[in-house]
């Protein structure tokens, strides 16, 4: 694409993985502007063609979401030396780090719940557009210095109106993947993403990698330090049987909204009445926050 010829590679961000893609950081000549270039190799092969097309289509659909990486262009190129056809996706540069590299123990409860809410915002928009991410994990969640969340890597997403038999490979299976995805990646539904969200929340609030799905409920029973209202929500998210999980992300939001109100909506003013003597008594015993006034 001619508009990106004035950009030079300044760093290699990742080598080829299971999606056969490389990621580079580009800088515009004589400028402080940066973008990211993702090159998917071997797109003559149906699998990698599907990966390229899916990610490109998904990102264009979701391009207005604040919490999903933005696409700024795409191209088909041919390698000069090998003649290999490659697909290229140009993305916004996110000045941040993967959630997996964040010092979890240094995050406050408010910051953790903010990350969760932004993640839900991103996946809600994705699901509303018929897109299942299929690979939600801490390495695909970027966090900026200002704690803004950006979900990345839609390379193995499932688009409901795009069924392709070429993707009969097992992709994206890790400790954050739902058990049905481990059996076959095309088994993924919205509930599979919800399982992954639950696994991410578990990691965020414990600092530990999630256990196997078959052990998750027992592990959750012995978890310490997690908010008493959050625990049953996570348990439902990571149920081994998809039928036992939340029906959709809207149902999840309904349950978790009270926690968001407690930890995030702290600037709201609440007015209530009580006898003044009772009020003084509660304040004396420190049963009301000092911010509560007459």
Q: Which residue stretches match the model-derived regions?
A:
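AlphaC helix of the eukaryotic protein kinase fold
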Residues: 44-61
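Short beta-strand micro-motifs within the conserved protein kinase catalytic domain, predominantly
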Residues: 70-87
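Conserved short submotifs of the Hanks-type protein kinase catalytic core
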Residues: 82-98
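Activation segment signature within eukaryotic-like protein kinase domains
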Residues: 115-116
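Catalytic-loop of the protein kinase fold
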Residues: 127-143
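Conserved activation segment of eukaryotic-like protein kinases, specifically the C-terminal portion
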Residues: 167-181
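Regulatory extensions appended to serine/threonine kinase catalytic cores
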Residues: 264-294
């Amino acid at each position: 694409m001619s508009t990106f010829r004035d950009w030079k590679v300044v760093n290699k961000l990742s080598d080829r993985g299971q999606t056969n893609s490389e990621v580079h950081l580009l800088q515009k000549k004589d400028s402080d502007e940066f973008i990211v270039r993702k090159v998917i190799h071997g797109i003559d092969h149906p699998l990698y063609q599907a990966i390229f097309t899916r990610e490109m289509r998904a990102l264009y659909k979701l391009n207005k979401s604040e919490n999903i990486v933005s696409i700024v262009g795409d191209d088909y190129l041919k390698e000069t030396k090998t003649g290999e056809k490659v697909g290229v996706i140009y993305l916004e540069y996110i000045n941040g780090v993967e959630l997996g590299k964040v010092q979890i123990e240094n995050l406050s409860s408010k910051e953790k719940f903010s990350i969760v809410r932004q993640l839900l915002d991103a996946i809600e928009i994705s699901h509303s557009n018929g897109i299942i991410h299929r690979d939600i994990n801490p390495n695909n969640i970027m966090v900026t210095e200002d704690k803004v969340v950006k979900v990345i890597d839609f390379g193995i997403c499932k688009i409901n109106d795009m069924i392709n038999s070429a993707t009969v490979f097992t992709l994206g299976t890790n400790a954050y993947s739902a058990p049905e995805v481990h059996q076959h990646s095309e088994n993924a539904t919205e509930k599979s993403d919800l399982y992954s969200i639950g696994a991410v929340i578990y990691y965020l609030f414990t600092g530990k990698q999630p256990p196997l799905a078959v052990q998750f409920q027992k592990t959750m029973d012995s978890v310490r330090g997690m908010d008493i209202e959050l625990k049953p929500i996570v348990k439902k998210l990571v149920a081994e049987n998809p039928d036992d999980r939340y029906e959709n992300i809207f149902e999840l939001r309904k349950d978790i909204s009270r926690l968001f109100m407690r930890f995030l909506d702290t600037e709201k003013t609440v007015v209530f009445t009580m006898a003044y003597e009772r009020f003084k008594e509660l304040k004396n015993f420190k049963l009301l926050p000092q911010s509560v006034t007459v």
